[in-house]
Amino acid sequence: MRSMIELGEDMLQELKEEVWRANLMLVEEGLVRLTWGNVSGVDRDRGMFVIKPSGVAYEDLSPELMVVLDLEGEIVEGDLRPSSDTPTHRILYREFESIGGVTHTHSVHATMFSQAGVELPCQGTTHADHFCGTVPVVRELSEAEVADDYETNTGLAIVECFREHGIKPMEMPACFQKYHAPFTWGKSATDSVKNSVALEVCAQMGLGTWQLNAQQSGLPNHILDKHYLRKHGAGAYYGQG
């Protein structure tokens, strides 16, 4: 019979493999250039999360190169420095207890919204299938926040935005960090990447919609609710789950 330690090690190895594959998805889905993105996943039972190492090309990654940290930000396993965005991921895991994975990219259209400081309202059912309402813009950081602990304060600003506006993280698994780029999250590392894909597509669709009809006021609430709830609500019936 296998010990709990051995089972725990197997689960951690599985998480490292999932996070590695999720980072490769960023390239496959066209969400990143160079090394402009990272994915992490958390093991809540062990209080650890796994993240991409900093500045390593995606084609050079392997499960063994993933960095394991505890939720205090201390490296538990790994020889490389973790992503420079690690403190942001850590804060999101600490404060959003329902999430299991975080993705950060500089995907082109979503980053346009971040740089412009413009929210993305729900313009159609594609958006409603993934995001329950308007994707928010997180305020810019102050000079002191940037100088003191930039990445940690980025995470704190995201949490502040969601709490001040009463936004539930699993209903709105995305945001635009002003002047920076988008962050998404989900039930797992893989799920968080899928939400990044959806955000990028919805951002591109949103821009195109405004070009065609600058007066577009957004999807009526009764249609938004129907599409969101049929996929994510208590009586969800979309898919085979």
List the predicted regions and their residue ranges:
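Glycine-rich flexible loops
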Residues: 2-241
